[in-house]
Structure formats: structure tokens, C-alpha cells
Regions:
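Beta1/beta-strand and adjacent pyrophosphate-binding region of the FAD-binding site
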Residues: 3-16
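N-terminal FAD cofactor-binding segment of flavoenzymes
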Residues: 43-79
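Acidic, low-complexity/disordered tracts enriched in E/D and polar residues
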Residues: 370-454, 476, 480, 489-501
Length: 501
């Protein structure tokens, strides 16, 4: 084992994907990082279905090779009954469209990869207590009956749902429970199933070990009978799963809570919740591992900024702002998706709650949850569907080549957080009704400095200026994007350019 430093820069509780992603990123930045994991690896873990974005994250961590395992299942097609009870939608497989992994194996390999980079690991170990101090945190850890004292400037809690007390959880969706089991696959069942029924919905997929998992998501109140009977009832109501009902074996049905929540105080005096200790997703999205790792990448940037400037308020504000954005976007997306289910109009416990859910922070009022409530209840702007056909860039620029362009009067600016060289900075972001979100950068070009002297310049001179520090084709695409969204206009007395309607 490595020599324990006098004080860690960061100490992480939990060796799941969120904690390991943060550890690897921080180690690459040159920080001393320690970790405690309560269980011995390998250990069984559900959550094997990883969304397509996971490839980019593993490549970013230089760990893409860990996903290249012949036993992992890729390019799985799906059959879906959701919007129309009478119609089965066949979703074809896609290259790098998701992957089914063996989490016990992948987590162990990712941990080994982090240790090879310099991670100080205590496993198995249990946190006895944590005490805030002048220089960070003092942790008492039990390892094989031996008490270990740890000092760390920052603590990351990546212990999953058990890292958040019930009283700290703010539900962002109605309560839900998963009831699940495995049946033998024998390569017969090689596609995923998703189906909505009156008391919830079901997901099925082949997983490692020649097994097929059947998982039902329902309201806890509906579990009046034992879980096995309830699962069988739900399966019998389906078209896709009902042929499998005789393969479900008695005594092998399990349950777990899948209620989506956010922690009421995710950054508390440099004790920071990440992954599912901070925010749990509705299983409908099937992006839980990816989102947890993305949050870890964001917190690594925040920690890097904090350790270089402990007096700055930017790291905490940035992390909480990004977390709120993720929570709100996810909650609204899942609510819309549930509303599209054919059974949503049914007066059943599960679907009525999802139609009428209201965020309630009355028992969890903190600065963070008050900001969350404001964003959660904000009316979402509506954007017209953009033209999907390719824009004829050269043709448009040729028509406007000698025209003078001006910044639209609808353009505004606001200070917002941006990342520059792994540090958080305040930048001026561009706001316009046609843009879905404030823009600081467009294709890695900072917009505010570019806008300073644009008024009255011809299209040709703007292209010439941009092409001095970027490829010509890139400069043309940026300019046409701004023109097509009426951020730039040709006639300053008009609200939009004459070539865009």
C-alpha cells in the first residue's frame, strides 16, 4: 500500500463509478486522493445497462479499453409498447448504442485502474465518524478492527443512496419501487423489452451470466401482496413479457427503492455529495451511471478551482448550478415521457401521481432547495422545431457577401460560469430568444469578445477575420449559425435577416 499522506487533497467514500471517475480525474490533475470502500470486490451490482454516452466518458479517462470485453453485450435491439397499447415499436440495434456490462467486473477493473494511477485505497473499510476541522475534515475509519485517522481538505461522498439520509432527500418524482428477478436466457431472449401497464411499466434485457432480467417499476402502495405475486401479476398484464411468466422461479424475486431524489445540501463545508448520494435518476432514463460520472467530472473541475483559490465561491455555486440544471431537465423529461404513455389517462395510483406531481421542499428548505424550487417551477421556453435539412452555408454567404451585419436588438448578455483550462471562470454569455440556452462558446470560440466590434462589418470581412485563427469552413459555419438564428441581422432596422424566415 502507498504511504498515507499527512493530509489528502481529496478523500472519497465509495468505489462505485461516480467515486472512481472523480478519483481518476483528480489524480490526473496531480492531487493526492484517498478512498474507502466498505465491500470487498468483486461484488454483485445492478445497473449493468449503460447508455451510449458512457463510451465518451471512459475514453476521456483513458479507460476505454475496459469496455472492450467480449462478454459484454452490445448493439441490443428493443421492442417497446408505450404510446400505443396496440403497437409494438421495434427499435433496431445501433453501433455504440449502449452496452450491457458485468458491473462487478467493470467496477473492480476501474478501481484497479485508479489504484495504478496513485489512488490510496482502504478496502474493506467503514467510516466511523467525520468531523469538520479548520483545515478540512477528520475521518475515523475502521479497517479490519484497526482504527485509521484520515485528514483531508475535501471529502466526496460517493456511497450511493446509502450516502444520503432519508431526511436529507428531496423527492423530485413520485415514490417508486423496482421488483425484479432473472430467468435463464440460453441466448433465446436476445433483445430488450419495455412495456407500460396500468400499475407501472416493465423492462427486460439480457445481462451477463446467460441471464435475462425482468424488472417491474411500480408504486410502493401497490405492493400489498408479496413481491413475487405482484411481479407475476404485472407480467401477466403484458404482451411482451407474458410468454416468460412460467420461467420465473419462486423465491428469487428481489425489490429495491428507485425513488428519484436530490440531496438538500450537496456541498456542505467541503463535504460534497456526488453520484447517487447527490441525485438519483428515474430508471426510465437508463442513464444513471453515465449521469453520475458526468457529475463527477464537473465536481473535479470545481475541486480543482477550490484548491487553487479556497476563498472563491465559484466552485460551490458552479457545482450546485450544474446539479440543479441536471435535476430540472431530468425531472421534466421523465414527466413528459410518462405523459406520453398510452396508460397515462388511467386512474391508477402509479400514473395519476406522475401526472400531478409537485415539488415540495417544505421539509427541506435550504439555500440549495430554494434555488432548485425556483428553477423547477419556471415555465419552460418553447422553441420552434429547427429545420433539419442541411443549411447551404456557401450559398447563403455568397448572397450576403457584401452586406453589413448587425447584432440583433434582442441579444442580451449575462455573467455565467464557464470552464477554461480545468478552472471555473465567470464569462459573459449570449442570450437570444432563438437560442435554447445562454452561449459562452460556439464550437470552442468565445462569443463575447467576437461580438464587440461586429456592427457594420461586411460578411466578407467577418469571415476573413475569423479565418485568421480557425479553419475557414469552421468560421463560415459559425457565422451562418448566428445569422440563421437571427442573432446577427443584415438590416439593423429589421428584426431578422432578409434571407431567413
Amino acid at each position: 500500500m502507498k504511504t498515507q499522506p499527512e493530509i489528502f487533497d481529496v478523500f472519497i467514500l465509495g468505489a462505485g463509478p461516480a467515486g472512481l471517475c472523480a478519483a481518476i480525474r483528480l489524480l490526473d490533475m496531480g492531487y493526492s486522493v484517498g478512498m474507502i470502500e466498505q465491500e470487498q470486490f468483486p461484488r454483485p451490482q445492478i445497473g449493468e445497462s449503460l447508455s451510449p454516452g458512457i463510451y465518451n466518458i471512459f475514453e476521456y479517462l483513458n479507460a476505454g479499453h475496459l469496455l472492450e470485453d467480449s462478454m459484454y453485450l452490445k448493439n441490443i435491439s428493443a421492442r417497446v409498447i408505450w404510446e400505443d397499447a396496440a403497437h409494438i415499436y421495434d427499435r433496431p440495434s445501433q453501433d455504440k448504442g449502449g452496452i450491457i456490462v458485468d458491473r462487478s467486473k467493470l467496477d473492480q477493473q476501474l478501481l484497479k485502474f485508479a489504484v495504478s494511477k496513485g489512488l490510496y485505497l482502504i478496502q474493506p473499510g467503514k467510516l466511523k465518524q467525520s468531523v469538520s476541522s479548520e483545515n478540512g475534515w477528520l475521518l475515523d475509519i475502521i479497517n479490519d478492527s484497526v482504527e485509521i485517522k484520515i485528514k483531508s481538505k475535501i471529502v466526496l461522498d460517493a456511497r450511493g443512496r446509502k450516502g444520503t439520509l432519508l431526511k436529507e432527500r428531496v423527492p423530485i418524482a413520485p415514490s417508486a419501487i423496482a421488483v425484479w428477478t432473472h430467468i435463464e436466457s440460453n441466448a433465446v431472449f436476445n433483445e430488450a423489452f419495455i412495456e407500460a401497464v396500468d400499475d407501472g411499466w416493465l423492462w427486460g434485457s439480457p445481462v451477463s451470466g446467460n441471464r435475462y432480467r425482468i424488472m417491474a417499476f411500480t408504486d410502493p402502495i401497490l405492493l400489498k401482496k408479496n413481491s413475487e405475486s405482484h411481479l407475476l401479476d404485472l407480467v401477466n398484464k403484458t404482451k411482451l413479457f407474458s410468454p416468460l411468466v412460467d420461467k420465473i422461479k419462486s423465491g428469487l424475486v428481489q425489490t429495491c427503492s428507485v425513488t428519484s431524489f436530490v440531496n438538500q445540501n450537496p456541498w456542505n463545508n467541503q463535504f460534497i455529495k456526488i453520484g447517487e448520494a447527490a441525485f438519483t435518476l428515474d430508471p426510465l432514463s437508463s442513464t444513471g451511471v453515465e449521469k453520475a460520472m458526468r457529475i463527477s467530472l464537473q465536481v473535479a473541475i470545481a475541486i480543482n478551482t477550490y484548491l487553487k483559490d479556497p476563498d472563491s465561491k465559484h466552485p460551490k455555486d458552479f457545482y450546485e448550478e450544474k446539479l440543479i440544471e441536471s435535476v430540472v431537465n431530468h425531472a421534466h423529461w421523465t414527466a413528459d415521457y410518462y405523459r406520453n404513455a398510452w396508460v397515462c389517462g388511467e386512474k391508477t395510483e402509479f400514473w395519476m401521481k406522475r401526472t400531478n406531481f409537485q415539488l415540495d421542499i417544505s421539509k427541506n428548505k435550504t439555500d440549495f432547495t430554494l434555488r432548485l424550487e425556483k428553477e423547477f417551477n419556471k415555465e419552460k421556453p418553447k422553441f420552434e422545431n429547427k429545420q433539419t435539412e442541411p443549411i447551404p452555408v456557401d450559398f447563403i454567404l455568397y448572397q450576403l457577401w457584401n452586406e453589413e451585419i448587425f447584432i440583433s436588438p434582442k441579444v442580451a448578455y449575462k455573467a455565467t460560469y464557464a470552464i477554461n483550462n480545468d478552472l471555473i471562470e465567470l464569462k459573459q454569455a449570449l442570450i437570444h430568444p432563438n437560442l435554447e440556452r445562454p452561449l459562452v462558446y460556439l464550437d470552442q470560440v468565445e462569443l463575447f469578445p467576437f461580438f464587440k466590434n461586429i456592427n457594420g462589418k461586411t460578411v466578407s470581412s467577418v469571415v476573413e477575420h475569423l479565418s485568421k485563427f480557425m479553419e475557414l469552413e469552421k468560421s463560415k459555419k459559425i457565422l451562418v449559425f448566428l445569422l440563421s438564428n437571427q442573432v446577427f441581422i443584415v438590416d439593423k432596422n429589421m428584426q431578422k435577416s432578409k434571407w431567413f424566415f
